[in-house]
Amino acid sequence: MREALARLAAEGFVEQRAQRGMRVPELNFEELQDLSTTRQIVESETIRLAALLGDHAWRDSVIASFALYERDIREHGERAVDWKTTEPRHHQFHKAVVSGCPFPTLRGICDSIHQRLTRYRLQLDAYRFGTDEVIGEHRLLMEPVLSGNGDRAHAAARSHFGLSLSILEAELQFRPALESARPGKRPRP
């Protein structure tokens, strides 16, 4: 148990408090901006390299993971995507996209950042987009990646991650007001 908690603490999922055990850290703007900016830098470059260096088998895996993700979205939602249900396929799609990069350390960093940002996505329930918008946004990322044009893929990735950041920031900003408006909840001093 201690080893598992130590690993979660090292990855930023829990924090240790002196003489008080562990707790899940609060969501905050600084961490969100740090993770998102790091993702824009690291994953966009990883995607650029994947677009330039990925082979036919990699392209096939990106297409297949996108098809599975699209199918899951269409099966689980009509007006708004249920991220709690579709997140595994979403993660699989992003892993497939970066898997064309031949550098495992870069891919590992991308995966770690994605997992930490998933905590924000799921806790904030921030993405209230319809199925067509979500599918379209990921298609806009996939197409330049598959074209082999590293610069276009890099730009598409930065745009994709920038949109995600702006949505999460807006939700995080309004979260305290939403929490205090719930029945039976008192506003925090």
Language model regions located:
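Short linear motifs at protein or domain termini
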Residues: R2-L52, L165, E169-P189
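Short hydrophobic/aromatic segments of transmembrane alpha-helices and their interfaces
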Residues: L5, V14-Q16, P88-H90, V134-I135
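Alpha-helix N-cap/N′ positions at the starts of helices
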Residues: Q19, V42, A64, E133-G136
